[in-house]
Amino acid sequence: MFDLFEPERRAINQLLVGLRDEIIKKDASVRGFNIGMNSGDAAGQTVDHAHVHLMPRRQGDVPDPRGGVRGVIPAKAAY
């Protein structure tokens, strides 16, 4: 994200908003989203290009949604 030009950042934001609207339209059970992007080796980036994860969330899909996506797969939460 930090290496992108402003028009690219705006395009990503527009894409995320459009995808959000499309997902909610198709699935009314979606109540929120996690948006993820790793930037740099220390942050866990494993591919050498910008990419964004948009994860639809539903009420009660995990016991406690605090902490974001780390708790979605309990066996993988502590890493």
Predicted regions and their residues:
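HIT superfamily nucleotide-processing domains
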Residues: 1-79
